[in-house]
Amino acid sequence: MKSKTDPAKPHIVLCAPRQTGKTTLIERIIREARESAAGSPIPIYGFQTKKFAGSDGTSRIYMFPAGGDLPVSIPAEARYIGSTCGRVKDVCPETFDTYGTALIRSARPGGLLIMDEIGHMEKNSPLFLRAVFEALDGDIPVLAVARYTEGDAAPAGQPPKAGDQTVSGDYLERIRRHPRVRLYMLTEDNRDAVYDEVRDILFTGRKEAKDHEPL
């Protein structure tokens, strides 16, 4: 029995500096998936992370279901992944391996899997990273963000050249070079064009394209 998804379509990975619109792009894709112009809305799976700044300058980071309301049964402690204050202060690998893994593996055929974002905090979470690569090996469409570091540069839709040492963390480089991934280096100049390409890849053949405003 064939999957409801199209195995020929690439997964999408975005890589960009801060304040270039990657979160806005993902939120637009999520809204459009839910506002299907033809047929049923596309289910959203996966995770998004959010920072909450404290009065002492420390930002605490929590994991949430992608595009969804948080179940009241999931306490904040179970979603806490770490904190930063200019740099990483602490990390909770168990949250990635338990809650994060469960959110990734909840994805079902016919849906869209969001992973926003994958960075350096996950390096000691093997179960989570295994789930990430299983998703990239699979046919459920993935829209993910990989952490940007200085030196990351490649044309939109293209992987970095062989030998480039552009990503800290072997797993981040493996994500970018995965054979099923189409990598987009997002900038303020190309973000609208990238949005058009991403929505075409994810939605063509599934729902009518709709007019949209620039990001």
Regions found by a protein language model. Name each.
Residues 18:
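The conserved Walker
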Residues 2-9:
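Phosphate-binding P-loop
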Residues 81-130:
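Phosphate-binding/switch loop-helix module in NTP-utilizing enzymes
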Residues 14:
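Hydrophobic anchor at the beta1->P-loop junction of P-loop NTPases
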Residues 25:
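Hydrophobic positions on the alpha1 helix immediately C-terminal to the Walker A/P-loop
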